[in-house]
């Protein structure tokens, strides 16, 4: 059956989101149509506002409303440590445990030859510039996910950073291989930070 064009466009829009296939997109489209008009308007405004009002911190690459972000601007944080993560959502996960008080650097991806992603496609160059510019940084804690791509990215960064006489550590693997930081509970993350190992 052919859907009316507005529904087809809505389904296509939902399918642009990661992890949303045609069945889920169709279900979301029909749910949206059944929503109250005020709720649809609020939903649309939230999308527009998030896209318009948020940007990336020029220092760490995290999502922010102001530049630098609140974490980079906070003088009470330990500026001798930088945790390197894949995505902004990983910063949120680590902040939720309220045990780590250093800084972050968001890569916005990992090295993935299969997907054609090399070092120039993620935020590695800005990390290296940051380390050269800020002599207070004494340790880089690599917190990429425990996936083959995350491991390859961690080893690549470690090779680049070690000559600068900066300690490079990796989260302990309280995290299961193949798991994402985003889904780990606070205690697992705390143990992983505490048990980090030099690489």
UniProtKB/Swiss-Prot annotation:
The keyword Zinc-finger is assigned to this record: yes
An annotated Gene Ontology molecular function: DNA binding
GO biological process: DNA recombination; DNA repair
Source taxon at top rank: Bacteria
Zn finger (C4-type) location: 57-72
Record SMART domains: TOPRIM
Record carries keyword Flavoprotein: no
Keyword vocabulary terms for this entry: DNA damage, DNA recombination, DNA repair, Metal-binding, Zinc, Zinc-finger
The Toprim domain, residue ranges: 80-176
Record-linked NCBIfam families: recR
Function comment: May play a role in DNA repair. It seems to be involved in an RecBC-independent recombinational process of DNA repair. It may act with RecF and RecO.
Record family assignment: Belongs to the RecR family.
Protein name as annotated: Recombination protein RecR
Species the sequence originates in: Ligilactobacillus salivarius (strain UCC118) (Lactobacillus salivarius)
